[in-house]
Amino acid sequence: MAYYMDTWAAAPAERPGMIASLSLSFKKAFAELFPQRRRGHSEGDYPPLRGSANNSLEEHYRWQIPIKHNVFEILKSNESQLCEVLQNKFGCISTLSCPTLAGSSSPAQRVFRRTLIPGIELSVWKDDLTRHVVDAVVNAANENLLHGSGLAGSLVKTGGFEIQEESKRIIANVGKISVGGIAITGAGRLPCHLIIHAVGPRWTVTNSQTAIELLKFAIRNILDYVTKYDLRIKTVAIPALSSGIFQFPLDLCTSIILETIRLYFQDKQMFGNLREIHLVSNEDPTVASFKSASESILGRDLSSWGGPETDPASTMTLRIGRGLTLQIVQGCIEMQTTDVIVNSGYMQDFKSGRVAQSILRQAGVEMEKELDKVNLSTDYQEVWVTKGFKLSCQYVFHVAWHSQINKYQILKDAMKSCLEKCLKPDINSISFPALGTGLMDLKKSTAAQIMFEEVFAFAKEHKEKTLTVKIVIFPVDVETYKIFYAEMTKRSNELNLSGNSGALALQWSSGEQRRGGLEAGSPAINLMGVKVGEMCEAQEWIERLLVSLDHHIIENNHILYLGKKEHDVLSELQTSTRVSISETVSPRTATLEIKGPQADLIDAVMRIECMLCDVQEEVAGKREKNLWSLSGQGTNQQEKLDKMEESYTFQRYPASLTQELQDRKKQFEKCGLWVVQVEQIDNKVLLAAFQEKKKMMEERTPKGSGSQRLFQQVPHQFCNTVCRVGFHRMYSTSYNPVYGAGIYFTKSLKNLADKVKKTSSTDKLIYVFEAEVLTGSFCQGNSSNIIPPPLSPGALDVNDSVVDNVSSPETIVVFNGMQAMPLYLWTCTQDRTFSQHPMWSQGYSSGPGMVSSLQSWEWVLNGSSV
């Protein structure tokens, strides 16, 4: 999955005939575009995001979600509804793509692979660049960026004419691109995320040395860009630049490209996030030339296989049933941030073995002391439990091997025991090593088979349990990873053959992004959005829909607002399709459960979600009108407010991390909630209504308004609505109304975090509003309260709020949304490693200077080396 800007604004470039420095060009362009940066402005000084669900930030992130061919066919027939739901619910634009069905030829073939330097791999591929899945594709362009024929023409034909339009804008702004220069545009409908247009030299015998130097210059500029100036690029595909219509001799061309790449990285210590360089062509002579040059300059292919092959991704995720997520992760077991980490060892020696030693080293001496007690015990248990101590987990499950018991049965029983211990409500995630493959010397394929069997059996038996199961493979243990990868693929295929629609998703997990991209020809949902959080939520919703075999549950309190028209739609769906729909309403939440065959199920869910989006907008619109009315009361500014209403709703933008917010961030993280983003809320109309309410409370009671900073968790789907019209009890997460039917806030982040851990899986994002709440006069709450009780028996005036404990309140309940003003929205996760993923640093305020531009811009490198 990728998350890149797809358009860039024109930048001033070095003029032809001058030596171009990439660093200099970039700095000049940046200074010209964003002069406020020179004046030392912090991120808080940049223009904020405007509006409601769709902010005007023009930085786009593009992700691809792989799906099965049968799912593609179903979604294709519901594509307009899918687009509408993703747009209205998550603010994302979506398209469907299926290269194989579109007539693409044979799958991509890799014919050479070699480690260039530690951390970067170079490979040669036979593939069509218009369908090669990498982060950036290099186009062989001309000085005018007119993409009419050859590779350039093919890229525009497949990717869309917007690529040519962006190129024309660049030329209009900066003029021709010099030979050796590059320009960056979006990729349109191509499976990559941006195109690097490189202007290669034309070959002439009389000026051959100049052409050679210019080709080297172009390659260096490409490498500079992907290693220094766009740190989000991990994979780049480069063609045999200039070897086509520019008539550069093929073998000389490929040799120069390889030698330039080798020399570029020879002494480099820093190379950004780049991990793979693909040399790509769909023509056999060019592929052969690239391969020959690679072997000559880099040495022979060190791969263990003889023929073309595609690497598996570094992380695999499989959704099983309703609540279980199974992942294969490359990483260190002792660094996992799940609730449980699994260790193993012989009964009298839990300290032997590489995994055990790594865990003990990280956990500290306290765990060693605990295990010393276990070693002295004569009782045999399959699994011993200790605290996590200095590990980032709550518990460690120690699997005890026994030399006199069948090792296959031990592993089977140990897996079952570990998983059953996860039924405790405070455990939502567990990390296993490749159990049995070390000290027990089980065949790796056998261990994988047993571990998967037990996970699947657990998921089948405990369908309602939300649990993330990670199998963590040490990064250098490629053989074990491939074996577990193959077993996961086999299990996924079995799910699909049995009618389960669960899509096997190759995606980032535990902070790692997949390396190789989608398999060529794989159908996919292409998502584009302006916020990483929105994209995560959209992906989670899609996967939850597709993993359901024959049922889907929609939880949305706006179901309470469905009228006759909407219920007629539900009835019509049950008549015209093979689905049944049941509605459940409780004091905590309202749900619709849809059951039926997969195709009908997806169709019904799409239509219902569209309907609920309309209802939510209608309800919010009415509340907004009331809000405008309240904010104008008692003032002489009604006419001014009326004019503002036409052009202003609210602002939600990255907050500058003041000392106060940094301290608050530490409070979140102390409770196990890792902050990925904090946004400030600015809604002048809501603030005016809040201040009016505050004034009324201060005039009414001697205690005044009693303002406090409190917290409330809100589902993603209601975050923008709260920013727009304020808090309402139907917008919060489900709760037990033990103190009355009001709007619940908490003073304690620890209490909020404890509730999150019991109800949310570790891979979900958590949204917490920090608000100024007018508590005023309060009393003990009661479940029968629909408004606060009177100030005293028989009094007409009532309290302003109720609490859980009058002497030391932790939970505060108000019954009027105007008593709470949202100030900040904190987006968190329980997975610390996920919170450190580089995607969160793009456009969010995680520290001084960590802000992306609020403009689209095309960056051009121009100039000549001679």
UniProtKB/Swiss-Prot annotation:
<dbReference type="InterPro" id="IPR057049">
    <property type="entry name" value="PARP14_KH_8"/>
</dbReference>
<dbReference type="GO" id="GO:1900182">
    <property type="term" value="P:positive regulation of protein localization to nucleus"/>
</dbReference>
<keyword id="KW-0548">Nucleotidyltransferase</keyword>
<dbReference type="GO" id="GO:0032991">
    <property type="term" value="C:protein-containing complex"/>
</dbReference>
<keyword id="KW-0013">ADP-ribosylation</keyword>
<dbReference type="GO" id="GO:0045893">
    <property type="term" value="P:positive regulation of DNA-templated transcription"/>
</dbReference>
<dbReference type="Pfam" id="PF23254">
    <property type="entry name" value="KH_PARP14_8"/>
</dbReference>
<dbReference type="InterPro" id="IPR052056">
    <property type="entry name" value="Mono-ARTD/PARP"/>
</dbReference>
<keyword id="KW-0051">Antiviral defense</keyword>
<dbReference type="GO" id="GO:0005829">
    <property type="term" value="C:cytosol"/>
</dbReference>
<comment type="similarity">
    <text>Belongs to the ARTD/PARP family.</text>
</comment>
<feature type="domain" description="PARP catalytic">
    <location>
        <begin position="635"/>
        <end position="853"/>
    </location>
</feature>
<dbReference type="GO" id="GO:0010608">
    <property type="term" value="P:post-transcriptional regulation of gene expression"/>
</dbReference>
<keyword id="KW-0677">Repeat</keyword>
<dbReference type="GO" id="GO:0072570">
    <property type="term" value="F:ADP-D-ribose binding"/>
</dbReference>
<dbReference type="InterPro" id="IPR043472">
    <property type="entry name" value="Macro_dom-like"/>
</dbReference>
<dbReference type="GO" id="GO:0003714">
    <property type="term" value="F:transcription corepressor activity"/>
</dbReference>
<dbReference type="GO" id="GO:0005737">
    <property type="term" value="C:cytoplasm"/>
</dbReference>
<comment type="function">
    <text>ADP-ribosyltransferase which, in association with E3 ligase DTX3L, plays a role in DNA damage repair and in immune responses including interferon-mediated antiviral defenses. Within the complex, enhances DTX3L E3 ligase activity which is further enhanced by PARP9 binding to poly(ADP-ribose). In addition, positively regulates DTXL3 protein levels. In association with DTX3L and in presence of E1 and E2 enzymes, mediates NAD(+)-dependent mono-ADP-ribosylation of ubiquitin which prevents ubiquitin conjugation to substrates such as histones.</text>
</comment>
<keyword id="KW-0328">Glycosyltransferase</keyword>
<dbReference type="GO" id="GO:0097677">
    <property type="term" value="F:STAT family protein binding"/>
</dbReference>
<protein>
    <recommendedName>
        <fullName>Protein mono-ADP-ribosyltransferase PARP9</fullName>
        <ecNumber>2.4.2.-</ecNumber>
    </recommendedName>
</protein>
<dbReference type="GO" id="GO:0002230">
    <property type="term" value="P:positive regulation of defense response to virus by host"/>
</dbReference>
<dbReference type="GO" id="GO:0005739">
    <property type="term" value="C:mitochondrion"/>
</dbReference>
<dbReference type="GO" id="GO:0005634">
    <property type="term" value="C:nucleus"/>
</dbReference>
<dbReference type="GO" id="GO:0042393">
    <property type="term" value="F:histone binding"/>
</dbReference>
<dbReference type="GO" id="GO:0003950">
    <property type="term" value="F:NAD+ poly-ADP-ribosyltransferase activity"/>
</dbReference>
<dbReference type="Pfam" id="PF01661">
    <property type="entry name" value="Macro"/>
</dbReference>
<dbReference type="GO" id="GO:0140802">
    <property type="term" value="F:NAD+-protein-C-terminal glycine ADP-ribosyltransferase activity"/>
</dbReference>
<dbReference type="GO" id="GO:0000077">
    <property type="term" value="P:DNA damage checkpoint signaling"/>
</dbReference>
<keyword id="KW-0399">Innate immunity</keyword>
<dbReference type="GO" id="GO:0000122">
    <property type="term" value="P:negative regulation of transcription by RNA polymerase II"/>
</dbReference>
<dbReference type="GO" id="GO:0045087">
    <property type="term" value="P:innate immune response"/>
</dbReference>
<dbReference type="GO" id="GO:0005654">
    <property type="term" value="C:nucleoplasm"/>
</dbReference>
<dbReference type="GO" id="GO:0060335">
    <property type="term" value="P:positive regulation of type II interferon-mediated signaling pathway"/>
</dbReference>
<keyword id="KW-0539">Nucleus</keyword>
<dbReference type="GO" id="GO:0006302">
    <property type="term" value="P:double-strand break repair"/>
</dbReference>
<keyword id="KW-0234">DNA repair</keyword>
<dbReference type="InterPro" id="IPR012317">
    <property type="entry name" value="Poly(ADP-ribose)pol_cat_dom"/>
</dbReference>
<feature type="domain" description="Macro 1">
    <location>
        <begin position="109"/>
        <end position="298"/>
    </location>
</feature>
<keyword id="KW-0227">DNA damage</keyword>
<keyword id="KW-0808">Transferase</keyword>
